[in-house]
Amino acid sequence: METESKDSPIGILTSVRQEMVAIACLLNPISLFKRNGVSYYHGEIDGIPVILTRSGMGWERAQRAANGLIGAGSPKSLIIAGFAASLSPGVKRGEIIIPDCVQASQNLAPDTPSLTPSIPMDDVIRTPHIHINKGGLITHDRIVIHTSEKRAIAGVHPNCASLDMESYPMAMEAEKAKIPWIIVRGITDDFNEDMPLDFNRYVGANGETSASLVALAVCLRFWKIPAMIDFGKNAQQTADKIADTVHNFILSLA
């Protein structure tokens, strides 16, 4: 990794395209470059240099993406941003959570220590229309579909208010590189809410859900259409709130 300078960018790691695009819309100017077959967006947010990429879902992809971004951009700090599920009745869909710790699911990385963000949550500039929660985050090995699964995980990890699939390995690589980091997650589904489909069945080799396979699945289950429309609308609104929160945090570093 190159030596950090005052012009080193802020790194932003997302998991899927929808999250990345919402943040990429903030970059002006913006340029695209590739390194080792991975696409990176480089540009500025209100004059502050940033470098942005996505990993795809899952531990190994997240770890590779973190290593790649650190090597490609030599960031001075890292923002891990994207979607999450709620593990608490008090954390609602459409809200933002900035975890005060992140843990790894035991079936992914047994006996690994909890990691604490090295950038304090209080550094994030607040906006009136975005509700920000605190609480722990657990990184799991799959998309959690049913309320019963959420309750079981929450019972094992009572201090965790949200769940994702990428944050722990991303934070772990930042720790190894001695790069300050923070997590910004937007809630796509409530604690007492089942997902409209088992999206695990439609994840492609790139770690993204296949739009064509999801569309086919919905056509075969036409009664799911209203729930999918509602889910998609909320996901886009949540992606925009994630981008707003990331924007405000970047401004706080200026």
Task: Describe every region a protein language model picked out.
Residues P29-F33:
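Assembly/interface hotspot detector across virion components, adhesins/toxins, and nucleic-acid enzymes
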Residues E2-K6:
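N-terminal hydrophobic/helix-forming segments and targeting peptides
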Residues D7-L27, E44:
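Short, conserved "active-site rim" segments that organize catalytic pockets and cofactor/ligand binding
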Residues D7-I10, K34-A254:
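Glycine-rich phosphate- or other oxyanion-binding loops that anchor nucleotides, phosphorylated ligands
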